[in-house]
Amino acid sequence: MKVLHICNNFIGSTVHQKMVQASRQRGIQNVVFAPVVTMKGRVMPGEDEHAVVCVNKWDRFFFHHKQEKTYRALRKTLPHMQYDLVHAHCMFTDGNVALRIKREYGIPYLVTVNNTDINHFFRLRILLRSRGIEILREAAGIVFISDAYRKQLFDKYIPAEYREALMQKTHVIPFGVDDFWLSNLCQTKGEELQNKELRLVYAGDVCRNKNLETTLRAMGELKARGWNVSLSVAGNVVSQRLYKKITSDPAVTYVGILPKENLLELYRTSNIFVMPSFHETFGLVYAEALSQGLPVVYSRGQGFDTQLPEGTVGFHVDPYDHRTVASALEQIAEDYPAFRRRSIESVARFDWNAVATQYQSLYCRVAPGADKAATARRIDE
C-alpha cells in the first residue's frame, strides 16, 4: 500500500514523524509532502519525505490563495499521483488539498481533526465552515486524537442532517509516546504523601495557552487548605511577562529546557503533573508523565480528556476555575498510591506500535484496490 501524507507541520512535529516511521515498519510505503515557509535550521528526517518552501507567513490569512500555491507545489514535486490513499493530517489546510486530489484523480483520503481545525477554523473563520463540512463529507475516514474533540466538533459545528453519516466514518486514535519513555518506565511504588507535602511539575512552553496562572491560583487555594505545595517548571519561555510572574512566587522553580533524560529525573522527584491548557490537540507530555508514575490534571473537553476513564489516572478540570484544579489535585493526593499505580499501567495504550497497527487497519479498510492482503499480514506479525 502506498500512502501520500500531506502534513504542513511535519518537520516541526516529531509526532507525525514517529507515526510515519512506525507505519513504514508495518509495511506501508509512505510519501510525505510538507509545505513550509522556510527550511532555515530544518532538515527532513527521512526518505520519500519532501519539505517544499511554497508559502509565506502572510498566506495564512488568505486560505484559498495559500491552497492554490500548496497544490501547485505538490503537483510539481510529486507529478505522478499513484497512491492508494491520501492522509491529510490537518483537516482544513491539508484536507482541502486532499479533496482536490480526490476530485481530479479519484484517490480516497483520510483527514485528522486537530485543535487548529476546531478552535481556529471552525470557531473563528465562519466563511470556511461550509468548506470544512465538504471536506468531511467527501473523506473516506475522519480521525480524531480524542473522543472529546469528536464530541466538540459534532455538538458545535456539524449540521444535524450530516451527523449520522459523518459519525459512521469517525475513528479515535491517540498519538504515541516516544520509545524512550516506554523503555524507562518507573518501577517504584507510590507511597502515601507525608505531611501534606505536594510537589507539582509542568513541562512545556511558558505561554498563556498552558495556563500556568490558573495553576498558581490553585496552589494558593491548596495552601489555604493546609497543603505545602511547590511547582517545578521546565520548558521554553515564550512569554516573558508570564515567566516573571511565575518566578516571582517562591514556591515555583524554573529549571529551563531539559533533555529527556533530565526531565525523566524531574518527573521521578515530583508527585503530580498539572497542565490545565485552554486548548490542546493531545498533549504528549501527559503520557510521558504517566510513564513515570505521575497522575495528571488536564482540561475538560481538550485532547487528553476521555483518553482514559475519568478518575483513573487523574481528573479533568475547568481551565478557567482554579478551584477545580485545586480539588482535582487534592483528590489525587488523598489516594496517591492507587493513582500512581494506574498511571504506570495505563501508558501502554500510547505505544507507537499499537497506534501504527490501528492506522494500518484503517488504511486497509478505506483504500480500495490496495494490496491489502500483504499489508494485513504485516499487521498480524
Give the role of each language-model region.
Residues M1-P45, N353, Q360, A370, ...:
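N-terminal subdomain of nucleotide-sugar transferases
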Residues L4, V143, E192-K210, L216-G220, ...:
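Conserved donor-binding/catalytic core segment of Leloir-type glycosyltransferases
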Residues A139-K169:
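A short, active-site helix/loop in glycosyltransferases that binds the activated sugar's phosphate group
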Residues L242-L258:
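Nucleotide-activated donor-binding/catalytic signature segment of Leloir-type glycosyltransferases, i.e.
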Residues I257-L258, E265-S270:
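Short alpha-helical donor nucleotide-sugar binding micro-motif in glycosyltransferases
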Residues F278:
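Aromatic "clamp/platform" in nucleotide-sugar-dependent glycosyltransferases that forms part
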Residues P295-S299:
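Short hydrophobic beta-strand element within catalytic cores of glycosyltransferases
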Residues E310-H322, E330-E334:
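Conserved acidic donor-binding segment of nucleotide-sugar-dependent glycosyltransferases
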